[in-house]
Amino acid sequence: MAQIKPRTLSGFMELLPARQVQFDRMVEILRKSYSLYGFTPLDTPAIEAAEVLLAKGGGETEKQIYRFTKGDSDLALRFDLTVPLAKYVALHQNELTFPFRRFQISKVYRGERAQKGRYREFYQADIDVIGDGSLNITNEAEIPSIIYKTFTALGLRRFKIRVNNRKVLNGLFAILGLEKQAGDVMRTIDKLEKIGPEKVRAILTDDFAVPGLSLIHI
């Protein structure tokens, strides 16, 4: 039998004991911080039905996920924690108390080319407030405050918190006449770090051109 050389797959993380202890301490700080602000821990399955994960992502998501079949089941590894959360709330909405405040710190998987800053397996540390209808604006303001205090607890001193609001983008797309294409435009912009500003600019101007208006500086 040929000898198998041990290796770690590209884009996957393995830590030596000392670093693993440090990492676990960081995760514990996150858990304590999130719990302190009234968020409940949640752990959703790493494997979901592929149709659930692909429900709103479209073709671009299909390119990113690890997908496989087991018997008659079409399955996939979760690529984020948001879609599993949506499924969880839809499934258990009659048993939950709203606003539902949850946190989840778990691994997610992306079937894309590994490169600097982009892994195939990595952790996400999410906090979300799910309302039964509309949420108070204080919930929006609370999240950056929690992030600030959590980063401070981790010992970070120099960091930026970038805030965005989907309503601002929706208003911009309405002005540009791109309401029906909003999802495609945002998925293109989301590739900024992956493919670079020049390619993003080319896609925006070639595929989503608006007469008399350039998207180059948006």
List each model region and its residues.
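Extended, charged alpha-beta segments that form solvent-exposed binding/catalytic grooves
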Residues: 2-216
